[in-house]
Amino acid sequence: MASFEPILTRHIHREDSHTLSGYKNVGGYKALEKMFKTMAPDEVIEEVNASNLRGRGGAGFPTGVKWGFIPKDSHKPTYLICNADESEPGTFKDRLLLNKTPHMMLEGMIISSYAIDCHLAFIYIRGEFYQEHKILEKAVEEAYATNLLGNDILGSGFDLEVVIHRGAGAYICGEEMGLIESLEGKRGWPRIKPPFPAIEGYLRCPTIVSNVETLACLPHILNRGADWFKSIGSEKGSGPKLYCISGRVNNPGVYEEPLGILLTDLIFKRGGGLIDGRELKAVFPGGSSSAILRADEIDGLRMDFDSLSAAKTMLGSAGIIVMDETVDMVSVCLNIARFYAHESCGQCTPCREGTTWLVKILNRIYQGNGSLNDIDMIFEITDNIGGLIDFSKGSFGKTICPFGEAVAWPIRSFVEKFKDEFIAYVAKGVEVS
Amino acid sequence: MPLIKIDDKEIEVEKGITVLQAAIDERIEIPYYCYHPALSIVGSCRMCLVEIEGMPKLQVSCNTTIGELPPERKKDGKYDMIVRTQTEIVKRERENVLEFLLLNHPLDCPVCDQAGECYLQDYSYKYGRAHSRFLEEKRVRKNEYLGSNVIINHNRCIMCTRCVRFTREISGTNELFVQARGDVSKISIFEDKSLDNMLAGNVIDICPVGALLSTDYIHKNRFWNLEAKKSICTDCSVGCNILVYSQNNRIYRLNARENHNVNGYFICDIGRYGFHRYEDAEKVTSPLIRSDGGFKPISWEGALKEIYEQFSMSMSGEKQQIVGIASPFHTNESLFMFGRLMNNIFKDKSIIGKLPFIEDYEIHFDSGFRISKDRSPNRKGLLDFCPNLEDEILQKVKAGEVRLCYALDDGVDRKLDEEWESFFKSQRFLVVQTYAMTPLAKLAHLILLGPSPMEREGTMTNDQGRIQWLNPSVSLTNKTRPDWEIIMEFMNTVGKRELKYTSVNEVNLEMGERFPDYRGRTFFKIGYQGLPKKNITTSRPSEGRQAIQ
Amino acid sequence: MAQNRTFKFTNPQRVEKILSQYPDKRSATLPLLHLAQEQEGYLTSAAIEAVAELVEIHPGEMMDTVSFYTMFYTKPMGKNHVQVCQTLSCSLNGADSLVDHISEKYKIAHGDVSQDGKISLVKVECLGSCDTAPVIRINDSNYESMTVEKFDKIVESI
């Protein structure tokens, strides 16, 4: 592996990395000063566009392009929301940033707000992140105390208020329209698009929703330039990336590597290989919403947006969950299906009814009461919830938000790739009866 | 204007409307559940998916707006959008959505009130699959009361949330909400804050399936037994358009009928359940004459003879006063005839009055829906056709003169205070035209049997000046005669006229001849949506009198 | 369900502060609900109505929001509210046996409160601590890399 100097997590081992002074000691808020002194908002957008920064929340949409969707002639206020509602199974990178270097994200928020002319920004933090919330509150307090937030920030004439908003336990609020509804005090039922949030988001005003990690990249882009950022990783996706490794590996954790690193390097080098030297069976490359990969599919596979979508899965949240040879794939599939049934918001017919149906069928198979027909049914039901998946043309979602696809992809991939295990369960049931 | 193609049909549409609206306007069927033209768009039922050329996935037609493409990007060189509603993929998708909706549905159509007018039934029949693939146990929940008149059957609910949006966007009362999430979510109310507002019954109308049920109608009849009549509500001066469902001359329920010039899509609960008042009233079944402190039936011939004896005296110069009491509950045609009788036959011996108007709270909803404080249907018509109405009739009536009174009864809503009671008691002869033994009827010497509001036919003028057709929802019983006909007979008998109208339409034509504002406002012209008055004359008393004479 | 008939925020300044942070009142819903729940341990009907009044919506609409989120409780939880993550990484690393242990020891199933009111148990979805699976959460604190023995010790100590 080529040597790579961590950028986002470089200083997190320091005891004071989460404090303002700790952050400032390692060059924190320098980008902000530079921006206020030398850059107009349009120039910030240009720089971010040039950096090829793509959103780290899951969809991988280019950040600068998203900013560009805000109507120029709008008389309404513009809002920025930092999406810190990290809840994708197998994902804990934003939590690390919130815990260890909240100011990096805050600096990114100020930069982003300046670029899009936002004066009130929110951090929507997952309700379960209690400690992180406390740390973040302290960080925001410090920022206000030193005029990094509030009126006339650092004498620039730019004003920004930041409000921390706690969620209350709902996976779907990580979806931007669900998040916006939730911030408005409603249930987190994703609103139908169009209009898109950049046109009509929070309180029907132009709104940009950005992931924690995405925002944390911004100070570095401004500090060291778009070209530098672009030089990290591959053509297909540039910049540093936080990868989460969990499951049956020796060294689970968050690892910062360039976009495009080999999946095998992450599992076997960073993750320390599998527990007890067992054989790798399967891996989720991008959280539980990505299609699962069999051990024989990962050789040479690079962790970037395009390579993974060519492999008919996705980078998603870069939550890598590793399963070894002893793992029962039927039970894992049932576990995943349960998660989605529990988290389905219940708004769209296919998702509300289909997720529970899947759980019931999978449970029946797991209990030994399944039939071969059930296996085919699972294919059909996942298609009917998430759409026929054609990677050459994009996904064919059938629901308001991408949750439908997020259910369909993994469940379908389990049955497709480990069909023999499902058949074995069916056969076992036949034997018993 | 954008030019689009839906299947094989070329349509020019207004820019900005949705594909579903365009299809509905063109009567191209795209099935849907959560969409309702009066409510916000949520796009959650996924039933209205269609194929749109150039879009990678199916789109919900309810949220896809039609814009204009620049010339070089037009589809097939001329279309701004090409929509396909009948392709294999669209059909399969409908089948799939229906399968999901029916998974936990009890399929209890034989005992469901919605059967026959159920979109789940209809679409399943048209677009659904023939067999069920669901082997699991169904989700079962108990029925619950949402309000005094509304029950929910959760098992039949498809979570389209039309009812929830109705309470937020139309009634503005917010009682209904979605409880919990995912497949355990259900429509609910908060503790004792039940669904009891003046518009509550509409949620039953807009529920596309058999989930929301009326306690008033539950298990009373089957939809296919009922005959629907398009009419208007007579419980306030708004004149909401309604559908009256009956079988064998018995009314079972009222639904709202769409009219964007009057009530939109909804009606209030006063009107919805109001017809029971006529059922509960003590009915009059024949003309009656006072006898030994009570009443006894009398034939129509006998009744007219009695009228002749009492009233024709007044024509012969004896100083008498004829008091006519008109009513804002009657049709324009009846009031027109009544005005003629009083003004043209009794002339200056007559004086026309009315009882105090029946009023209550005026209720306005933010959505624009309105219940008028004027709880009679035809005050405007009354003022138009009896322009010389005396407001202070109690004072105007000269004391001591022999008095004969002919009163059109307001009906079951009318109460009499002591002053009015003694006024009527002081009449030498009191004729009351009514359908029920009301307090006023009880004072009569002679009762003429007219139709109840559900039997009446003719036009009413609502408080916006819109002329609408009151269509009888049940037919006249044996001895009942239309109000206008009774008045005509009165005129023929007392005034020696030879009027021979054979239907309310003939009266309506004559009325139009004499009142220019009403010219051409025949049933043929106004249809079931009504038309505004022409406003050729203003109804100043003097002009009105000229029109009569 | 015995519930308090009235509810009053004990910290009105905090309420004012929260309301002042948002451009509209309704956006203050979630933080106000959190505050009310901190005060009483769960959301009583009176608290739900009080928050609804503050943000000027119908209590029904407030319940619409409350019932959507798993972290809002409309009935009392145990003094120690134990939440066991059951999502994949935790499940792969022994979350199920933790649930079995707690269920057996305190005679409670998912969603129950022990008879003495000391412990309540819910199975929850991913707590975002997959690298230290299995993870449980007691009240507001996460406890990582759990074992049955560790759990018993922690419960004793708090």
Labelled PLM ranges:
Chain C
Residues 1-158:
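Signature of N-terminal electron-transfer/Fe-S-associated modules in redox systems
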